């Protein structure tokens, strides 16, 4: 799935008759709750609720960075923390190009295509204060704010070319619908890497 933050939406786009919402789970795994506000040319405008994430910034090609980021975060939730506690697996794994961040924060990087931020959603039972402390300082916790995103779902093997094609499709849908885009793209990976591409 690919998505982008929304700056503004042209008036005249109707809301769905019965606004759809996600209960905050996917295939038995906890996921960030959202509400579908509109359908736009095969995409959905979603309002995501605030949630807590653990994230790392990694350098490399898209697929390599995803594997490295996933591995580091999986190590954390499977006990790579000061209390050796396990944290429940959630979905999705999120990947996005890193953006320039003010010098006062720990990570400053331009989104030149080889610097990526990979994140896991943390279970709702935790706060920043109650999560186990990571064994590494490369993992940071981020509390998201409500975010309106335009989202395009797709299946299959999500290689770099396919992700770029889906993002271009999403941008075209948004432009045609008068949706002004903000940050992105965000890539959401919901299924295990061993899931067959036609599932």
Language-model region placement:
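A solvent-exposed interaction/effector surface
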Residues: 2-199
